[in-house]
Structures are given as C-alpha cells and as structure tokens.
C-alpha cells in the first residue's frame, strides 16, 4: 500500500532542496538554449533540476514513473500507478530575464487521480502544497475555500497574446471579457497563476495551451479549495496531453465559459 504521508514529506524536502540549488545557480552563468521556438527557453538549470528529482525518485520509489518537461523521465502513455508530473522551472523566461516569477511544479498522481500538488515560488520561499482530502496550504497557512465573485469585480490572469491576432482563438472572443473584468494580470508562469487562483489572489486564469507539467500540480491545489478547471471547450483534462485551460472559482468559471467561450460556437 502506498504511504502517501511519507511521499508528501519527502517531496516537500526535495522541492526545497531543489529550490536552494536554483538559488545558488543565480550567481553562476547560465547555458541557454531554445526548444520549439526562439521564445521557448531551456537552461542547464532546468535540465539539472529535473535530473535531481529523477535520480531521487528512481532511487527512493523505483516503482514510480516520471513525466518531466525536459524529457529525461519515462515515456508515459497512461497514468496507471504512481506518476510524478514535473516542471523543474516553470517560467524559464522569467528565470533568465528577471530571476523571479518562476516556480518548481510537481503533481503526483495515482491511477489518474491527483494526490499531491506542490508549487514552489523559489525567490519568495512560498511553497503551495496540497494533499488530496487534507486541504491546500501556502507554507503553513491553510488556503480558504474560494469565494463566489461577480465578473465585474474579478481579476483575470491572461496573456495579452490571446486578445491580439493569434492562431488559437479569435481575438474578438476574449477582448470584451478583458474590458468587463476589474483588472488583468500576467505572471509568465502557469504554475504560479494557478497557485494564485487557489490562493484567491486572482479569480480566474485562461490560456490556450499548456502541457501537463504546467497544470498538474495546480489542479490538485484547486481541488482542495473548491476551484473549477476545464479546457475552453468545457472538457476535463487528461493530464497526459496539452490543453487549453480555464480555471477559477466556480461562479467565474461558469460565467466566462457560458457567456464568452461556449457562446463563440
């Protein structure tokens, strides 16, 4: 039988150790490469951090599998058993250019169910963590259940790309929403955006394409505070594929989906 309390304690220890290693690396020169496009950055620290987790998971939990952004884990085609979904540095562009607004993100799943979610804002030493059925926390502070919000008073996290000409959604769909809400924010790290939704600092987050390692941990957090998340089509996540994401408190999710996203059909 899986000892989830032990896994939770060990994962928290590892994520803080990895954060300390990243902090130390900020005083050293980075090796920066590009992946799918010139703005899709990866550094030697991304790769080293992913390897840090893989080495420890394989040694401590040899039966567990790993889905990592940098491709050093396993080839995952199902979520059978225990699977760690890891983004060693979510917000690499921020890490390179700002040395802030990035996070380590780890979701741990068993047979497709999110059991543990960890998002560590390294620079601010804020660890958002959730254990299925036991609540969500920021460090030692328990996160409150999300409150209902009217759209006119909502803070929406959205990248400006989605209200300009792009190939994923007509810019006219979301522009009226941006005008209607109280304000918008963009942090450049999907994990931190989802953590901020779970913490009630922002009311909703919308984006057109995220990989499983971008959203897995955040979804575990949202489960524990009563948040809602789907694709922009209203479909559930597979946690194996790239998806669009609409996440927020239930009332805001419902309003955005019904009045803006579903209406576009």
Swiss-Prot record:
Residues involved in Mg(2+) 2 binding: 87, 90, 214
Binding site for substrate: 69, 89-92, 185, 214
Observed phenotype of the null mutant: No visible phenotype during 5 hours of growth, decreased resistance to oxidative stress caused by diamide.
EC class: hydrolase
Catalytic activity: a myo-inositol phosphate + H2O = myo-inositol + phosphate; a ribonucleoside 5'-phosphate + H2O = a ribonucleoside + phosphate
EC number: 3.1.3.25, 3.1.3.5
Record key words, sorted: Hydrolase, Magnesium, Metal-binding
InterPro entries in alphabetical order: Inositol_monoP_metal-BS, Inositol_monophosphatase-like, Inositol_monophosphatase_CS
Residues that, per the record, bind Mg(2+) 1: 69, 87, 89
Necessary cofactors: Mg(2+)
One example GO MF annotation: inositol monophosphate 1-phosphatase activity
Protein family according to the UniProt entry: Belongs to the inositol monophosphatase superfamily.
Protein name: Inositol-1-monophosphatase
